[in-house]
Amino acid sequence: MVLIAACILSKTGKLLVARQFVNDMMRSRLEGLVDAFPKLIGNEKEAATRQHTFVETDSVRYVYHPLDNIYLVLVTTKNSNILEDLETLRLFVRVIPEYCRSNEEKEILAHDFDLIFAFDEVVTLGYRESVNLAQIRTFTEMDSHEERVFMQIKEAQEKAAKQAMAEKAKELKRAQKEALSRGLKPSYQSSTGISSSSTPNAAAVSEPAAPRPSAPKGPIGGGKALKLGGKTNNEDDFLDTLRQQGQSIAPVQKASLSGGVSSLAAPISTAPRVKREVVHVRTEEKINTRVSRDGGLESGEVQATVTLSIGSPEFIPISIKMNNGSAAGTQLQVHPNLDKKEWQSSSTLKIKPNGKPYPVNSDVGILKWKMALSEEEQLPISFNCWPQESSDGVQVNIEYTLQREDITLNNVRIIVPLPTATAPSVGECDGEYEYHKTKNVIVWSLAVIDSSNSSGTLEFSVPNGHCDHFFPVSVGFTSENLFVPITVQKVVKNDGSPVTYSVETTFNSENFEIV
């Protein structure tokens, strides 16, 4: 097909919006084609009642659709495919209500540029693009998740700077009152030019002028703190402030604010901190997976790192006996400074003879593993997302099933995107839910998922939208149970005497999506 132009005309023949898609046609020629259209349909009695119809001249074809007080007209070549033209016309008809509340002439003129931008997403150089209505809306909005995160951090920084200034002012007032109560002149008050010998008690008795609040020292609210991707000393304070305001954001990576997991789905651990002994072993395990909405695993991988921290030199010559419960397909790798033969024969982590000793008070990686997932049944939790379109809107049902009952999931959050400016009506929810209007998402939260609540459901409906609006679904959780059960059995010195040690294990979802 070759689509020459798309036009919106009033029933009286007035041209409201026109978008030309070919470059080899003069404006006067296009205006002549558009002006001829009302005359061609003027004698057709059924023109106002037909759903889809067309008229032809010697050179072009007009495919049009009547909409209340307007006509939507596509001007095409005569050799174009009429079926494709009608399909394109139907998409154009669906575009207009997305940007205009009615089909009145005033409303069309008020959103003419919005319609032109949308038309450009449908047709390029006279040929139809493979897009749907949701994609057109996304492309024209040009929404940026990174920009939203940056603005949130910027607002938090400004608020933190104001709080710091207020605290500094209070501190200065307290120091002023304490100095007055002791009968001393505050050290921060500037000299008035009067000799202290001439009026010895004036400075001590008179009420000093209120000090001007000075800008807080350090990087609080400084220009460099707003640098995108920059690392500042107060970064953790700003992120903590965000969390106190109810926002959950992922750690800001250097040189980029974008990540595979949305800020709301970033795992937050509320597990009590382990009392650290002189010998401390920490295992951190993460899962990355993409699951198809129709079922089946697109990609999946579990990665883990075991680190060792020793607080005293006398405990450096130690051996760590591990319970190796790794499944088939798990790739394990020990540190090059450790004895691989000891690991292969007895699952013991021990420094090689004449090897470099462990550093003191420093986390050192000693073991890591990676496991590729090939089936959805291997995941610790699975989801069934089922949006159903109807004349009243879209009914969405989401069900989770805990597949590994030996793993207890904490702080589980399922983030479901929603159509723009659409509030959900929740019918059933196991756990809690929260609607974030600014982010256009509904967050389904469960404090704990274990064998006692191994399945649950969230049901809600929205008045508009379609199935693609509710994907991808992001999932965040944390757990103290490892996916690959490789744990510490005992820690002993080289002479065989036992060593008191502490263990810390975490299993988090780094990027868990249903697409």
UniProtKB/Swiss-Prot annotation:
Xref: PROSITE patterns: MHD
The family database entries (InterPro entries) matched by this protein are listed as: AP2_Mu_C_sf (IPR036168), AP_mu_sigma_su (IPR022775), Coatomer_dsu (IPR027059), Longin-like_dom_sf (IPR011012), MHD (IPR028565)
Low complexity bias located where?
187-198
Q: Name one GO biological process term.
A: retrograde vesicle-mediated transport, Golgi to endoplasmic reticulum
Region annotation Disordered: where it falls in the sequence: 161-231
Q: Where does the protein end up? A: Cytoplasm; Golgi apparatus membrane; Cytoplasmic vesicle, COPI-coated vesicle membrane
Q: Where are the transmembrane segments?
A: none
Any one GO CC term of the record: COPI vesicle coat
The membrane topology term of the UniProt record is: Peripheral membrane protein
Q: Where is the composition biased (Basic and acidic residues)?
A: 161-180
What are the MHD domain coordinates in residue numbering?
276-515
| Top-level taxonomic group | Eukaryota
Task: For this UniProt record, give its keywords in alphabetical order, as a comma-separated list.
Answer: Cytoplasm, Cytoplasmic vesicle, ER-Golgi transport, Golgi apparatus, Membrane, Protein transport, Transport
**Cytoplasm keyword on record:** yes
What is said about its interaction partners and assembly? Oligomeric complex that consists of at least the alpha, beta, beta', gamma, delta, epsilon and zeta subunits.
Q: What does this protein do?
A: The coatomer is a cytosolic protein complex that binds to dilysine motifs and reversibly associates with Golgi non-clathrin-coated vesicles, which further mediate biosynthetic protein transport from the ER, via the Golgi up to the trans Golgi network. Coatomer complex is required for budding from Golgi membranes, and is essential for the retrograde Golgi-to-ER transport of dilysine-tagged proteins.
Under what name is this protein listed?
Probable coatomer subunit delta
Q: Which gene encodes it?
A: copd-1
